[in-house]
Each structure stands twice: as C-alpha cells, then as structure tokens.
Regions:
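Short, low-complexity, charged amphipathic interaction modules
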Residues: 1-27
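Short beta-strand-centered segments at strand-helix junctions
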Residues: 32-80, 85-132, 137-168
Length: 170
C-alpha cells in the first residue's frame, strides 16, 4: 500500500484519475492517442527562476503517461527570429529543461532543432524562456520529438512490446 504525506487535493485527484485510466486501459486492447508537439519540461531550478523561489507548478490535466500532467502555467519561447506565446509546461519537474516543438515552430522562431528521443538534449539548440518572474536563456534543450508511444509496463506487456520497439499505428 502506498502512503502519501502532505499531498494536495489536486495531486490526490490526479493520482485517482490516473489509477482509473490505467484500470480502464487494462480492459481494452485500444490505446488512446494524443498529440503534443509543443511543450516545455523544466528543472526545479528553472521553475524557481521563471516563477519565483519555491513555486509549485499547478496540475491542470492528467496525461496518459502515469505521473505526468499538463500544468496551468505557460511560458513564451523566444528565438532569433520570433516567439511562441503561451506554450504549456508539462510536469513533474525534470532533471534537464527540455523544449519540444514542431518543425514549423522551429522554423518560425529561427531554430534548427534535431529530431530526438525525449531526454536526449546534448548538442541541441537553446532558446530564451519568458515567465512571470523574468526571462531565462537555456543553452540547449530544443528538439523535435521523435515519434513515440507512452505506455505503462503493464500495457506494453499486454501488447507484447518492450521499450524501444517500433510499431505501426492505425
């Protein structure tokens, strides 16, 4: 049994929603599909810089990947040739700040970003992020996310899949 201390009502609701979604998906061979080509993952340090020390991101909506959520908070992304306004932050916080954009977004702001797997930020271009507490220039982290599917280990096992497998989606 899991024991949670100091958990907010929003976090509890998020955990319950994710548990119900996981149970429903166990009963189905269908996998829900969502597309999210424009979002930001932040480190704890970068949340502090952009929103103020100790600020806690606010969960807005649970995502299909357990423990992941879209936040109420958004940032502006500033590149050499333009900017993207109100880009959603995804939580929870990460070990490295990462900005996932569509190829069109990159072209519009003047960035040449590579197609990469999530987390593979080494050698990628950087941008400036603007939040309510000021701006922050991140030296790397902009990428076009490679196509992928988020599944729980139980879902993957039900389909006979392992991490890194290639699939066709119909």
């Amino acid at each position: 049994a899991l024991v949670y201390h100091d958990i907010s009502q929003e976090q509890l609701l998020l955990l319950i929603t994710q548990a119900v979604q996981a149970e429903l998906q166990k009963r189905s061979r269908q996998v829900p599909v969502g597309i999210s080509v424009r979002h930001i993952h932040l480190t704890r340090d970068d949340v502090d810089k952009l929103f103020g020390y100790g600020y806690q991101l606010t969960p807005k909506k649970a995502l299909s990947q357990p423990g992941q959520f879209a936040c109420e908070e958004c940032l502006d992304i500033i590149g050499p040739k333009g900017e993207l306004k109100h880009v959603r932050i995804l939580g929870p916080e990460r070990s490295a700040t990462q900005i996932e954009l569509a190829q069109t977004d990159c072209r519009n702001i003047g960035i040449k970003a590579p197609v990469r797997s999530s987390g593979d930020t080494k050698g990628t271009p950087g941008v400036t992020l603007r939040g309510p507490n000021g701006t922050l220039t991140v030296p790397e982290g902009v990428m076009i996310a490679d196509r992928h599917i988020h599944m729980t280990p139980a879902q993957a096992a039900a389909f006979g899949l392992a991490d890194g497998d290639r699939v066709q989606v119909k």
